Amino acid sequence: MSKDTIFSAPIEKLGDFTFDENVAEVFPDMIQRSVPGYSNIITAIGMLAERFVTPDSQVYDLGCSRGAATLSARRNIRQPNVTIIGVDNSQPMVERARQHLNAYHSDIPVEILCDDIRNISIENASMVILNFTLQFLPPEDRQSLLEKIYRGLNPGGLLVLSEKFRFKDDTTNNLLIELHHAFKRANGYSELEVSQKRAALENVMRIDSSNTHKVRLKNVGFSHVELWFQCFNFGSVIAIK
């Protein structure tokens, strides 16, 4: 696994964060050291896939990056005639996802597409995964994407939505931000790396509260919505149609 050193030296002209070749190369290390509870979420996605994926249906991983959630789901699906469709708008991520998934034998076909998730049709879905993806979409596009997912899910289908959260109470919000930064420092990131990455993400990752997500999902039509995992200011919501 290549180590993330992207922000380790001072960057004079710090641009917006992008999922380019450099990020794709170190992404597994970056996300493990940056997102508390990430491995737990990936493992649980497989457990949820085993429970919710139905025969003759499709599974979508929207914003699949290098395919960790796709692989976890595929390893645990026990039903026949299931297809997994992974989508990411970063060509370097897509290329690595294909390589990663092709390294493991499976009878479940996986199609990895390089496209904007807003352009993808969702059809005959028993499970949809949005793992730290929605936060990178313009806020005005989030409702329409969730509506499309809801329409494309079969009755009883599952959406897994993992995100970084903000909190209404400033004291709590600041505490959880500080704990997240402490988590990153404990994983070997310097103060410079933490501050430069935070600045690079400022304009491209706009986060909502967990309550905003839950209300939005209920407004879309989901019958059962619940926060099932949280560690500091990162968490995951399940929504069942």
UniProtKB/Swiss-Prot annotation:
Top-level taxon of origin: Bacteria
Gene Ontology MF annotations: carboxyl- or carbamoyltransferase activity; S-adenosyl-L-methionine binding
Binding positions (S-adenosyl-L-methionine): 38, 63-65, 88-89, 116-117, 131, 198
Key words of the record: S-adenosyl-L-methionine, Transferase
Gene3D superfamilies from the UniProt entry: Vaccinia Virus protein VP39
One Pfam family per UniProt: Methyltransf_25
Listed GO biological process terms: tRNA wobble uridine modification
Enzyme Commission code(s) on record: 2.1.3.-
EC category name: transferase
NCBIfam families on file: carboxy-S-adenosyl-L-methionine synthase CmoA (TIGR00740), PRK15451.1 (NF011995)
Function: Catalyzes the conversion of S-adenosyl-L-methionine (SAM) to carboxy-S-adenosyl-L-methionine (Cx-SAM).
Protein family: Belongs to the class I-like SAM-binding methyltransferase superfamily. Cx-SAM synthase family.
Protein name (database record): Carboxy-S-adenosyl-L-methionine synthase
Source organism per UniProt: Actinobacillus succinogenes (strain ATCC 55618 / DSM 22257 / CCUG 43843 / 130Z)
Gene: cmoA
